[in-house]
Structure formats: structure tokens, C-alpha cells
A protein has these predicted regions:
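Conserved acidic donor-binding segment of nucleotide-sugar-dependent glycosyltransferases
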Residues: 238-247, 255-257
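Acidic anion/phosphate-binding donor-loop and adjacent secondary structure
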Residues: 45-49, 78, 91-108, 114
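Donor nucleotide-sugar binding/catalytic pocket of nucleotide-sugar-dependent glycosyltransferases
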Residues: 63-75, 81-100, 121-122
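Conserved catalytic-core segment of nucleotide-activated headgroup transferases in glycan assembly
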Residues: 106-108, 113-167
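Nucleotide-activated donor-binding/catalytic signature segment of Leloir-type glycosyltransferases, i.e.
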Residues: 162, 167-188
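Aromatic "clamp/platform" in nucleotide-sugar-dependent glycosyltransferases that forms part
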Residues: 205
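Short hydrophobic beta-strand element within catalytic cores of glycosyltransferases
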Residues: 222-225
Length: 264
């Protein structure tokens, strides 16, 4: 039997993989099918006004919800009585794994071998102007942290990947902080880049995941993070920080690996 079909009329279940996509399907179809809607994160604005009204309009057609973090499940329970299914992120150990020879990797990607390398692999800039920081991802926080680190650590290098990195790059250049930028890379390369790092930092204000947390965990990449998304499910409490105590955060690679490998 087919697991998925292109024609929703032939489906037993309709999966709204992102909340806004519900408007792309006919109400007639949604009424006649079992509908599951994935909610990856909720922001403060989602609990009132036009955003809550939009949620209520969509909820008429939703039978149950899917979330990837317990934090989102708890938030969602405040605005719905419908069933919420928690299925956490998964991670493929054939793609993401530890590589011991970090010196060779740094040489391969022209990363200074003697540097303390800090990674950030997610977009940081709004798409409408390619200048403004995407504040939900916390790039302003990232810059504050690496600026302080740069004053205390010799030979700091920031390693960036992904599109829409204009804000962070501009700020790094203002501060004269060394960086290496590899825009779009495949999984093999990204795994090698994780393995080139001394530290990965998640500075987001709100997240569904991010996937980088489990990818760091299973590759044994040292990571610290704000308390967003799945952070508290994967990372040791000492690896989770706020902007008042970030310099005290300590990576625990064994703890993160143990929790991430369960998702393989």
C-alpha cells in the first residue's frame, strides 16, 4: 500500500506540515479527512489577537497535533484540548558522527589550525532586506558572546554556513573578528564542519529544535544553548544559559551524546 499520495482526495490522513499551509487545501477535503497539524514552536504573539483567531479557524479542521519538543507541547496545551502527539527529532548516525582527526579537517576547509573555532550554522538575517537581524534566532546575542570571547581568547575564529548570514558577517567585520564562511554545503561537509569546532553556540530566543542540538550531540561537538526547543531534553543543565550567565555555561559532550544517540 502507498504511504503517501499526491491527490489528497485519495488520502486517509492529511498532514499539515506547517500551520500556514492549511489554507492551501480545500475546506471540503479537510472536513472529510483525519487532519494532523505540526506545530514546531509558538511565540508570545500566537496566544492572542489575530494569531489566536487564525489558530481557532484552523483548529476546526484539525483532529490532533504533532510537536517535536516537550516545551512546545506544554505551550500548545494552553490553547487546545485536542490530542498532542510528541515525536522528537530523529538523527541519522550514518550522516552525523564523530571524527577524531580535526587537524586534517581544518586544513581541508582552510580553518586556522591553532584557532579556537566557534560555529553557527543557521540563518540570522531577515529575508525582506538581507540586513536586519532575525531576532528570533538571536544573532545579536551571538555577536555579544563572541565579542566577549574574542577579548579573552587568542585566535578566535567563527565558522559560518548557510544562507542569509549577512547580519552576523557585517557585525564580525565591524569587530574585526576572524571568520570562515561556507555558504551552502552537503551533509558530508556539514558533518566535517561540526567536527572542526571547539564550540557551537545556539543563541535563539524561540526554536522548535533546533536540529543543530542533536547534530552536535551525536557528533560530540561541544555545545551550549539558550533554553529553547529541545535544549533541555538533550543538553546538561550546565550547558544551558541566559544572557546573564553565558560565560559560565559548560559543554557536556558525553551527556549530549547519550541523549542524542537515542534518536538514531
Amino acid at each position: 500500500a502507498e504511504v503517501s499520495v499526491e491527490d489528497p482526495k485519495k488520502a486517509d490522513l492529511v498532514w499539515i506540515i506547517s500551520p500556514w499551509l492549511w489554507k492551501k487545501e480545500s475546506r471540503k477535503i479537510l472536513k472529510s479527512k483525519t487532519v494532523i497539524c505540526s506545530i514546531f514552536h509558538l511565540e508570545d504573539k500566537d496566544f492572542s489577537g489575530k494569531y489566536l483567531k487564525e489558530f481557532r479557524r484552523r483548529e476546526k479542521y484539525v483532529d490532533f497535533y504533532h510537536v517535536i519538543s516537550l516545551k512546545t507541547k506544554k505551550d500548545l496545551e494552553n490553547i487546545t484540548d485536542k490530542k498532542i502527539v510528541y515525536i522528537p527529532f530523529w538523527v541519522n548516525g550514518n550522516i552525523w558522527f564523530d571524527i577524531e582527526d580535526k587537524e586534517t579537517l581544518r586544513d581541508k576547509y582552510s580553518i586556522p589550525k591553532k584557532s579556537f573555532v566557534v560555529g553557527s550554522f543557521q540563518r540570522d538575517t531577515e529575508g525582506n532586506d538581507l540586513i536586519s537581524p532575525k531576532l528570533i534566532k538571536g544573532p545579536d546575542r551571538f555577536i555579544k558572546i563572541v565579542d566577549q570571547m574574542n577579548s579573552e581568547i587568542d585566535n578566535l575564529t567563527v565558522l559560518l554556513t548557510g544562507k542569509r548570514r549577512q547580519y552576523v558577517i557585517a557585525e564580525l567585520e565591524k569587530l574585526k573578528i576572524n571568520y570562515v564562511y561556507l555558504e551552502m554545503v552537503d551533509f558530508k561537509t556539514l558533518n566535517e564542519l561540526y567536527n572542526s569546532l571547539d564550540l557551537y553556540i545556539v543563541t535563539s530566543r524561540i526554536e522548535g529544535g533546533p536540529q543543530a542540538i542533536v547534530e552536535c550531540g551525536i557528533t560530540r561537538t561541544p555545545i551550549i544553548s539558550t533554553d529553547v526547543g529541545i535544549a533541555s531534553e538533550i543538553l546538561h543543565k550546565n550547558s544551558i544559559f541566559n544572557m546573564n550567565n553565558y560565560m559560565n555555561a559548560k559543554p557536556d559532550t558525553d551527556f549530549a551524546f547519550k541523549n542524542s544517540v537515542k534518536l538514531d
